[in-house]
Swiss-Prot record:
Subcellular location: Lysosome membrane
InterPro entries associated with the record: C12orf66-like_central_sf, KICS_2
Keyword field: Lysosome, Membrane
Subunit and partners: Part of the KICSTOR complex composed of KPTN, ITFG2, KICS2 and SZT2. SZT2 probably serves as a link between the other three proteins in the KICSTOR complex and may mediate the direct interaction with the GATOR complex via GATOR1. The KICSTOR complex interacts directly with the GATOR1 complex and most probably indirectly with the GATOR2 complex in an amino acid-independent manner.
Free-text function comment from the UniProt entry: As part of the KICSTOR complex functions in the amino acid-sensing branch of the TORC1 signaling pathway. Recruits, in an amino acid-independent manner, the GATOR1 complex to the lysosomal membranes and allows its interaction with GATOR2 and the RAG GTPases. Functions upstream of the RAG GTPases and is required to negatively regulate mTORC1 signaling in absence of amino acids. In absence of the KICSTOR complex mTORC1 is constitutively localized to the lysosome and activated. The KICSTOR complex is also probably involved in the regulation of mTORC1 by glucose.
Protein known as: KICSTOR subunit 2
SUPFAM superfamilies reported for this sequence: FLJ32549 C-terminal domain-like (SSF160651), FLJ32549 domain-like (SSF158548)
GO terms (BP aspect): cellular response to amino acid starvation; cellular response to glucose starvation; negative regulation of TORC1 signaling; protein localization to lysosome
This protein's encoding gene: Kics2
Amino acid sequence: MGESIPLAAPVPVEQAVLETFFSHLGIFSYDKAKDNVEKEREANKSAGGSWLSLLAALAHLAAAEKVYHSLTYLGQKLGGQSFFSRKDSIRTIYTSLHNELKKVVAGRGAPGGTAPHVEELLPHLSEQLCFFVQARMEIADFYEKMYALSTQKFINTEELVSTLDTILRKYSSRFHHPILSPLESSFQLEVGVLSHLLKAQAQISEWKFLPSLVTLHNAHTKLQSWGQTFEKQRETKKHLFGGQSQKAVQPPHLFLWLMKLKTMLLAKFSFYFHEALSRQTTASEMKALTAKANPDLFGKISSFIRKYDAANVSLIFDNRGSESFQGHGYHHPHSYREAPKGVDQYPAVVSLPSDRPVMHWPNVIMIMTDRASDLNSLEKVVHFYDDKVQSTYFLTRPEPHFTIVVIFESKKSERDSHFISFLNELSLALKNPKVFASLKPGSKG
């Protein structure tokens, strides 16, 4: 007979409780996580020591995480509620939790009813959880900042990406204990998705085809991985007259908002790079694919042209100062192309119903030059009628490098509300500050 294989040492009860708690938290089962540690605390209330203190802190952590992922704390006005209905700000909740965890760290070696090696583990975990709580506060502040930006004319996402990357670097490997791995994974996923989406927004606004395509794909892959967490979970619903059914767990508002931001960016990407994408498929399939976009900007413009007999609607990219500009689609990084000059510095990256009307382009560029200050306000609609060519031009600028122009080969009033409304709606759809406003649950986004 061979030698018997030694059995692994049994996992201490405390460690098993911790592993169960963090695995629940990692799949956003806040209530289960909270219930488990509260039951454990009730069963061991005579024990005292670090274990009991940590269990109390963990119950508060589960509650804080539920509020954090719901985003209900955004835009709270201080003093706007009565004392009894007042909701503590997320910062207050996490600060209080941080103080609780600090006490566990400070109580290292305090007498308690747990084994010595467990008493060593608890302060170590609490120390790492302190960093996690600090990271949460900084990301919560970041969401507050994004929500506040929804009232701005233009959102500089490059600044947001820089702030987010700084937070990620600061807390990278700060809560790395194996027991905390579900927490670390969900943190990395969330911040990774957000960073990719904001980078994609900045890259689309610079008309960078391949970088924005890759970044959007990375965000999509991470969101898919995250979404499977909810798909795998089933919750049982008992019916009034007996029987029960199971359905997938409803994801938290934060996840749904990130999906919404991705959908908006896909619509913008498919509009800005319509020319490059349409080369990869048939016209009918491209039309069917863009119709699924939300909003369907291509369909919106096509309907407007048919309804009001517009000669052309174009999205113009001002590539002056852009050394990397090489035209539609992907270009090898080492391929050489002379920098555009003259009218070629203002290409129509989107032109409907057909190619840009060359005869109108000098007029369009002249208006863009003469009315630059109005267009740079990023909210005004500029009107110009040229009696020589019997044509009317309406222009607006949704973001710094892009201008929308609507051309009619007839005289149109600058007060025509249909045209002004169309340009304002199209411009707003491209800026889409509403998606930042919709961070707050219940807002019209």
